Amino acid sequence: MCIRDRLLSGSAELLKTFIIKDKKDNYGKALRILSGPLDIDALSPLIEAAAKVKAKIVDSDPEDKDKRMVPNLGHTYGHAIEWWQHSNNVENPYTHGEAVAIGIIQAARKSEELKIAKPGLADKLKADFNYCGLPVEMPCTEDELEAAVNQDKKAEGGKLNFVFIKEIGHVTVKKI
């Protein structure tokens, strides 16, 4: 993986963390920093804040029952995109982080569809991610993506624990 791919994957992870939990507009700060030239000094406090958010989530759910699923935001669709790319021998496939970024946008769409989020969230995230240089276009159709989601090994009794976005800084886990 080249440095560009690593930076994009890290950018997706940072933004994802602040979509999950954000009390100090770290999401907005991250957008501003990630959209410009690489500035490690400006990014470092945000990376530290994101690590604290993730550690707090993991520590609050040592038995991996519900809250610990929250950092999987975007992964259900992201893994489906990766599976689809592999199954279709896609040349130059998205990296894991890039697929998760697109998965977050799709999770926002699903959140809107189920009235968990207000309309416009997915479009906002798509514009934000694009602004930061992340890929935002799905490599497959919606139907192909849904078929790939059904391949997810984490499905219990045909249902998945899915992380939905209520708004930036607030998510919820529901079985679908």
Regions found by a protein language model. Give the residues of each.
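Short glycine/serine- and small hydrophobic-enriched flexible loop segments
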Residues: 13, 83, 105-113
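Carboxylate- and glycine-rich phosphate/diphosphate-binding segment that chelates Mg2+/Mn2+
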Residues: 4-71
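Residue-level signal for inorganic ion chemistry
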Residues: 75, 104, 168
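Phosphate-handling active-site elements
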Residues: 85-97, 113-119
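Active-site His/Glu-centered metal-binding helix of metallohydrolases
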Residues: 73, 77-81
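Catalytic, metal-anchored helix/loop core of enzyme active sites in primary metabolism
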Residues: 60-62, 85, 174
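C-terminal charged capping/lid subdomain of soluble metabolic enzymes
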Residues: 12-16, 116-176
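Small-residue-rich helix-loop
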Residues: 98-106
